[in-house]
Amino acid sequence: YYVYGQGGLNGIYTDPAKAVLRADTLGGVVLNRTQQYVWERGNKKTKMQIDTEGIPEIVLQGTYDIKTLKKSLKKTGTVIDLSGCSLDSVLYEISAQRPVIAKTGADTSVVIVGYDEYNTWLYDPVKKETYPYGMNDSTDLFQKAGNVFITYIETVNY
């Protein structure tokens, strides 16, 4: 993962979360090896809602087991572990139409499928329902669970 900021290449990382954290301090961007934007500082829409019908079933199950996700999504895209990043940072992924699996407890998770000024929109893998949850409450919920966030970036075929 390539971090660009302050006019040039700043660093190369194997850990996407570390790349995002670095780019955030620089007001920069993170690109992958195929030059796709993985993350951009300050370039997210004010609100976004992703239709759950277009999300792969393995993501909707809310598993945060990286091996299982990689195996199931290998033809679809690359799994990106953003654990340790802030909720505000990972909302860029939603803005880019990428759902984010977020750990909420020891064995529980949700899929973040949207946000607006006041709420995140969370998909519950057990109830199979989407509901709004306050932004501050979401931040607290995810922080208490360790800020474990997993998303994926679709493969581009040139």
PLM regions: where:
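Conserved active-site-adjacent core of cysteine acyl-enzyme catalytic domains
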Residues: K44-Y158
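Short, flexible active-site loop motifs that bind/organize anionic cofactors or intermediates
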Residues: G8-L9, I80
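A short, charged, amphipathic alpha-helix used as a generic interaction element across diverse proteins
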Residues: Y13-L31
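Short aromatic-glycine-(Arg/Gly/Cys) micro-motifs in beta-strand/loop hairpins
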Residues: Y1-G8, G28-V29, Y37-T46
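Predominantly a core beta-strand signature of beta-propeller blades
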Residues: L9-N10, T130
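Residue-level detector of conserved, well-ordered beta-strand and adjacent loop positions
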Residues: Y4, T14, L31, V113, ...
